[in-house]
């Protein structure tokens, strides 16, 4: 009897392995996508928390000028400024020179649809920083005084 020297896999074995891999990818891909988006939302929340802390810290410095005096949404123009101003101190604390550089760090789908961080101050001088709608649901990320965790 003649011995053959067959090495490697047959076509049927390769097709079975590819089919199993396709099934695994089909099952695991949606979970992976959810995980990635959840991590992006978490990163955006960390960024908003940094903005909140920068605003609060700068507002407590009595030597800075341009600290918001009225409650409501603070325009992005107020968040631009030179050294010695509230807006300049906020940007300096965040390590950027323009407000657009802060907005460009947003990564989540929520942030990409609105692409702008909103800073709001209440009558007691407490800050709320959010992107999207002002809540912590699928349509917004909020930190600070107005966050309904």
Positions of predicted regions on the chain:
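Bacterial Sec-dependent N-terminal signal peptides
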Residues: 1-5
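Alpha-helix exit/C-cap motif
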Residues: 53-74
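Short, surface-exposed interaction loops/tails
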Residues: 75-83, 97, 107-149
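Aliphatic-rich helix starts adjacent to a transmembrane/signal segment
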Residues: 32-50
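N-terminal pilin/flagellin-like segments and related low-complexity appendage regions
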Residues: 61-65, 78-109
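N-terminal single-pass transmembrane signal-anchor helix
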Residues: 6-32
